[in-house]
Curated annotation (Swiss-Prot):
Any single Pfam family the record assigns to this protein: GRIP
Subcellular location: Cytoplasm; Golgi apparatus membrane
Record carries keyword Membrane: yes
Protein purpose: Involved in vesicular transport between an endosomal compartment and the Golgi apparatus.
Annotated region (Disordered), positions in chain: 16-41, 271-314, 814-850
Stored InterPro entries: Golgi-autophagy_related, GRIP_dom
Additional free-text comment from the UniProt record: Present with 2350 molecules/cell in log phase SD medium.
Biased amino acid composition, Polar residues: 822-847
GRIP domain mapped to chain residues: 861-909
Name of the protein in question: Golgin IMH1
Sites of Phosphoserine modification: S308, S660, S827
Gene of this entry: IMH1
Effect of Y870A: Impairs interaction with ARL1 and Golgi localization
Coiled coil location: 101-280, 312-735, 766-814
Species whose genome carries this gene: Saccharomyces cerevisiae (strain ATCC 204508 / S288c) (Baker's yeast)
Length: 911
C-alpha cells in the first residue's frame, strides 16, 4: 500500500511538473485578476498567485487520486482472488510462487491424464472372456510375488534386528564417548585451573625470590664497593708511602753515590798516604840532616832526643788521620748496607701492591660482569613477559573461538529432539559456568599480569637506582683520585723537606728509626689488608655460589614454565578437538535420529540406509578408539604432573640439605632459608590439598556421570520401546501388504492414490484457508489505513475549499472597494458643482464609510482566524503523519514562506 502511495506521489509530481509549463503562460482571465489584485499588497498578491496555481492543479490531483484508488481496489480484488484460489499471500510473492503453482497444476493434470490413459488401455486389453490359463498364470505370478515379498519381509526383519543391535551398540558407545568427553572436558578445565594457579604461585614465588636475591646482591655490591673504596684508599696511602720511600731511596742513592765517591777518594788518599809518608819521611830525614848539619855548624850542641821526638810526633799525626778515615769508611759501609735493605723492602712492597691492584681490578671486572648478567636477566624476564602477554592474547582468541563453537553447539542442541531438552539445559548451564569461569580466570590472569608488570617496573627502577649509585660511586672514586693527587703533591713537598733534612747525618739516624717504625706499621696494615682481602674473596665466592644457585633455580623455573606452556597448548588443542568431535557427534546423533525417523516411511531403500548406518557405526568406533587414546594420553599427563610434584618435593629436600649445610653461616641467612623451606612446605601442602580436591571432584564427577549413564539407560529403554512400536508398525505393514496382495484389482491402488490426493488437497485447502484468513486480516488493516487516509484527504479538501471561498470573498471585496472609489470620485465632482443640497449628503457619507470600515475589519478578523486555524491544521497534520510530509511540505513552505535551506533544516530536525 505504501509503495502504491509513493507511486501516486511520483505520478502527481510528474503531472504537476508538466502542468507548470502550462501555468507559466498567463491567461487573459489571470491578467484581469492581476489587474484586480493591483490594489492589494505584494505579499497577499504572491500568496493569491500560489493559491490560483493550486486551484488549477486541484482537479488534476483529484482525478489522479481517483484513478489510483480504482487501481488499488482492483489490485485488492485480484489479491483476494489469488489468496482464495492460490497459495499466494502477497502480490510481491506472486512473481516467485505463481509460475511454480501453475507448473504444479500442469504436472498434476498431466499425471492424471496419463493415469486415465493407462487405465483405459488396461481395460481395453483385458477381454471380458479371459481364459483360465491366463488366470492360472496370474495366480502363479501372484504366488511368486507373495513368496518374494515374504522373503523380503524376512530379510527386512533380520536387517531390522541387526540394525536394532547396532543401534544399541552405537547408543552405548555414544553414551560412553559423551561421558568420557565430558569427564575429559572437566578434567582439562581443572588441570587448566590448577596450572594457572600453580603458574601464578610460581611466578609470585620467583618474583619474591628475585627481589630477595636482588636485595642480597645489592647489599653484597654495596659491601664490595665499600671494600673497593677502602682498598683504593689503602692503595692510595700505600702509593704515597711508596712514593715517600722511593724519594727517600733516591736521596739515599744520591748520598750513597757521594759516599762512594768519598770512599774512592779516601782509598786513593789511603793509597797515596804511604807514598806521601815515605816522601815526608825522606823530606824529614833530609830536613833533619840539614838541621843537623846546620846545628853542627851553628850550635854544635843539638841532641839526638830532639830528633826522636820529632819523628814520634809525625807518626802520631798520620795514625790519627788513618783511624779517622777507617771509621768514616766503616760508617759509610754500614749506611750502604741499610740502603740495600731498604731497596729489598721497597721491591717487596711494590710487588705486594701490584698483586693487590690486580686482585681488585679482577674483582671490579667480576662485579661489572655480574651487573651485566643481572641486566640480561631483566631483559629476558621482560621478553618472557611479552611472550606471556602474546600467549594470553592467543588464549583469549582460543576462548572466543570456543565460545563461538559453544554457541553453535547451543543452536544445534536447540534443534534436537524434545526428549533431550533436559540434558541440553544441563549442558547449557555447564557451558555458562565454564564461560563465567573462563572470564574470571582471564580477569585474574590479567590482574596478575598487571601486578607482574608493576613489579618488573619496580625492579627496573631499582636497577636504575643501582646504576645511579654506581655512577655516584664512580664520582666518589674520581674525587678520591683527586684527593690522592693532592696528597701526592703534599708528599712531594714533604719529600723535598726530607731531602733538606737528610743532608745532615744526625737527622738521618732519627729518620731511620722513624722509618723502621713506619715499616712495621705498614707491615701490620698489609697483614690486615691481606686478611680483609681473604674475607672479601670468601664473600665473593659465597656470592658466586649463591648466584649459581639462583641461576640454576631460574633455569629450572624457566624449563617448568616452558613445559607448562607446552602442556597448556596441548590441552587447548585437545580441548578444541574434543569440542569439534562433540559437535560432530551431536550432528551425527541428529542425523541418526532423522534417519531413524525416516526408517518408518522408507521401505524400498532400506539396504542403502543400513550401509550408511554401518559406515557411521564404523566411524564412531574409530572415534571411540581415538577417544580412548586421548584418555590414555591424559592419564600420562597426570602422571607427568605427579612426577613434577615429586620433583618439587625433591627440590624441597635439596633445599633442606642446603639449609643444614649452611647452618654454620650467619643467623640471618639461616632464617631466610628456613622461611624458604616453610614456604616450599606450604606449597607442597597446597599441592597435596589441591590433588585431594581434584580426586574428590573426580569422584563427584564420576557419580554424576553414573547418574547420567542411568538416565541414558532409561532413554535407551524408551528407544527400545519405540523400536517395539516400530516393530508392531512393521507387523501392521505386513498385514497391510497381505491385504494388498489379496486385492488384485487395480482400481484399489487408484482409489488409494485418489485418497492420498484428496488428503493432500484437504491439507492444501486448510493452508489456503489459513492464508485467506491472514489475507483478510491484512486487508482489514489496509482498509482501516485507507479510511484514515480518506478522512485526512477530506480534511484537506475542506481546508482547500475554505481557502478558495476566502479567496473569492477577498476578490469580491477588492472589486467592491474599486467600485466604491470610482463612485466616491464621481460624488466629489458633483459636490464641487452643487451648492446647498450637498450638505445632508456629506453628512450621510461618513456614516456609510464607518459602517463599511467596521464590516471590513470584522471580515478581516474572521479571515485571520480562519487562516490561523488552517495553518494550525496543516502543521499538526505534517507533524502527526509521516507518510504525508512530502506532500504537505510545499504547502507549509508556501504558508510560512520558507526557503530551500529552511526546508532542509526542517526535514533534518524532524529526522
Amino acid at each position: 500500500m505504501f509503495k502504491q502511495l509513493s507511486q501516486i506521489g511520483k505520478n502527481l509530481t510528474d503531472e504537476l511538473a508538466k502542468g507548470l509549463a502550462d501555468d507559466m503562460s498567463p491567461t487573459p482571465s489571470e491578467q484581469q485578476i492581476e489587474d484586480d489584485k493591483s490594489g492589494l499588497p505584494k505579499e497577499i498578491q504572491a500568496k493569491l498567485r500560489k493559491f490560483e496555481k493550486y486551484e488549477q492543479k486541484y482537479p488534476l490531483l483529484l482525478s489522479a487520486y481517483k484513478n489510483e484508488k480504482l487501481k488499488s481496489e482492483k489490485l485488492e480484488a485480484v489479491e483476494k482472488i489469488l489468496a482464495e484460489n492460490t497459495p499466494i499471500s502477497n502480490i510481491d510473492d506472486a512473481v516467485d510462487t505463481l509460475p511454480a503453482f501453475f507448473q504444479d497444476l500442469n504436472n498434476k493434470n498431466n499425471l492424471l491424464n496419463d493415469e486415465i490413459k493407462r487405465l483405459t488401455k488396461q481395460n481395453s486389453e483385458i477381454p471380458e472372456s479371459a481364459s483360465s490359463e491366463t488366470l492360472k498364470d496370474k495366480e502363479e505370478e501372484f504366488l511368486k510375488k507373495e513368496q518374494n515379498y515374504k522373503n523380503d519381509i524376512d530379510d527386512l526383519k533380520k536387517k531390522m534386528e541387526a540394525l536394532n543391535i547396532e543401534l544399541d551398540t552405537v547408543q552405548k558407545e555414544k553414551n560412553d564417548t559423551v561421558s568420557g568427553l565430558r569427564e575429559k572436558i572437566v578434567a582439562l578445565e581443572n588441570i587448566l585451573k590448577e596450572e594457572r594457579e600453580a603458574k601464578k604461585q610460581k611466578e609470585e614465588v620467583s618474583i619474591s625470590e628475585l627481589k630477595e636475591e636482588l636485595a642480597i646482591k645489592n647489599h653484597s655490591l654495596e659491601d664490595s664497593r665499600m671494600k673497593i673504596t677502602e682498598l683504593e684508599q689503602n692503595l692510595s696511602s700505600k702509593s704515597t708511602i711508596m712514593e715517600e720511600k722511593s724519594s727517600e731511596l733516591a736521596e739515599l742513592n744520591i748520598t750513597l753515590k757521594e759516599k762512594e765517591r768519598k770512599l774512592s777518594e779516601l782509598e786513593k788518599k789511603m793509597k797515596e798516604l804511604p807514598k806521601a809518608i815515605s816522601h815526608q819521611n825522606v823530606g824529614n830525614n833530609n830536613r833533619r840532616k840539614k838541621n843537623r848539619n846546620k846545628g853542627k855548624k851553628n850550635k854544635g850542641g843539638i841532641t839526638t832526643g830532639d830528633i826522636s821526638e820529632e819523628e814520634t810526633v809525625d807518626n802520631s799525626i798520620n795514625t790519627e788521620e788513618y783511624d779517622k778515615l777507617k771509621e768514616n769508611l766503616q760508617e759509610l759501609q754500614e749506611k750502604y748496607k741499610d740502603c740495600e735493605d731498604w731497596k729489598q723492602k721497597y721491591e717487596d712492597i711494590e710487588a705486594e701492591l701490584k698483586d693487590a691492584k690486580e686482585l681488585e681490578n679482577s674483582q671490579l671486572e667480576k662485579s661489572a660482569k655480574e651487573l651485566e648478567t643481572l641486566n640480561t636477566e631483566l631483559i629476558d624476564t621482560k621478553k618472557s613477559l611479552k611472550e606471556k602477554n602474546s600467549e594470553l592474547e592467543e588464549v583469549r582468541d582460543m576462548l572466543r573461538t570456543v565460545g563461538n563453537e559453544l554457541v553453535d553447539a547451543k543452536d544445534e542442541i536447540k534443534e534436537s529432539s524434545s526428549k533431550q531438552n533436559e540434558e541440553v539445559k544441563t549442558v547449557k548451564l555447564e557451558l555458562d559456568d565454564l564461560r563465567h569461569k573462563n572470564a574470571t580466570m582471564i580477569e585474574a590472569y590479567e590482574a596478575k599480569n598487571t601486578e607482574l608488570r608493576s613489579k618488573i617496573e619496580l625492579l627496573s627502577k631499582k636497577v636504575e637506582h643501582l646504576k645511579n649509585l654506581c655512577t655516584e660511586k664512580e664520582k666518589e672514586q674520581t674525587t678520591s683520585q683527586n684527593k690522592v693527587a693532592k696528597l701526592n703533591e703534599e708528599i712531594s713537598q714533604l719529600t723535598y723537606e726530607k731531602s733538606n733534612i737528610t743532608k745532615e747525618l744526625t737527622s738521618l739516624r732519627t729518620s731511620y728509626k722513624q722509618k723502621e717504625k713506619t715499616v712495621s706499621y705498614l707491615e701490620e696494615q698489609v697483614k690486615q689488608f691481606s686478611e680483609q682481602k681473604d674475607v672479601a674473596e670468601k664473600s665473593t665466592e659465597q656470592l658466586r655460589k649463591d648466584h649459581a644457585k639462583i641461576s640454576n633455580r631460574l633455569d629450572l623455573l624457566k624449563k617448568e614454565n616452558e613445559t607448562l606452556h607446552n602442556d597448556i597448548a596441548k590441552n587447548s588443542n585437545s580441548y578444541e578437538e574434543y569440542l569439534k568431535e562433540n559437535g560432530k557427534l551431536s550432528e551425527r546423533l541428529n542425523i541418526l535420529q532423522e534417519k531413524y525417523n525416516t526408517l518408518q516411511n522408507v521401505k524400498s531403500n532400506s539396504n542403502e540406509h543400513i550401509d550408511s548406518i554401518k559406515r557411521q557405526c564404523e566411524e564412531l568406533n574409530v572415534k571411540l578408539k581415538e577417544s580412548t587414546k586421548k584418555i590414555l594420553s591424559l592419564e600420562d599427563e597426570l602422571n607427568e604432573y605427579a612426577n613434577i610434584v615429586q620433583d618439587k618435593t625433591r627440590e624441597a629436600n635439596t633445599l633442606r640439605r642446603l639449609v643444614s649445610d649452611s647452618q654454620t653461616d650467619d643467623s640471618s641467612k639461616q632464617k631466610e632459608l628456613e622461611n624458604k623451606l616453610a614456604y616450599l612446605t606450604d606449597e607442597k601442602n597446597k599441592l597435596e590439598a589441591e590433588l585431594d580436591l581434584q580426586t574428590s571432584r573426580k569422584a563427584t564427577e564420576l557419580q554424576e556421570w553414573k547418574h547420567t549413564v542411568t538416565e541414558l539407560k532409561s532413554e535407551i529403554h524408551a528407544l527400545k520401546l519405540r523400536e517395539e512400536g516400530l516393530k508392531s508398525e512393521v507387523d501392521a505393514l505386513k498385514h497391510v501388504n497381505n491385504d494388498i496382495k489379496r486385492k488384485t484389482q487395480a482400481t484399489s491402488d487408484d482409489s488409494d492414490q485418489l485418497e492420498q490426493i484428496t488428503s493432500n488437497l484437504k491439507l492444501s485447502l486448510s493452508k489456503a484457508d489459513e492464508k485467506n484468513f491472514e489475507l483478510q486480516s491484512a486487508n482489514e488493516k489496509l482498509l482501516n489505513l485507507n479510511n484514515e487516509l480518506n478522512k485526512k484527504f477530506d480534511r484537506l479538501l475542506k481546508n482547500y475549499r475554505s481557502l478558495s471561498s476566502q479567496l473569492n470573498a477577498l476578490k469580491e471585496r477588492q472589486y467592491s472597494d474599486k467600485s466604491g472609489r470610482v463612485s466616491r470620485s464621481g460624488s466629489i465632482g458633483t459636490l464641487a458643482n452643487a451648492n446647498i443640497d450637498s450638505s445632508p449628503a456629506n453628512n450621510s457619507n461618513p456614516t456609510k464609510l464607518e459602517k463599511i470600515r467596521s464590516s471590513s475589519s470584522l471580515e478581516l478578523d474572521s479571515e485571520k482566524n480562519e487562516k490561523i486555524a488552517y495553518i494550525k491544521n496543516v502543521l499538526l497534520g505534517f507533524l502527526e503523519h509521516k507518510e504525508q510530509r512530502n506532500q504537505l511540505l510545499p504547502v507549509i513552505s508556501m504558508l510560512l514562506q520558507l526557503d530551500s535551506t529552511d526546508e532542509k533544516r526542517l526535514v533534518m530536525s524532524l529526522k
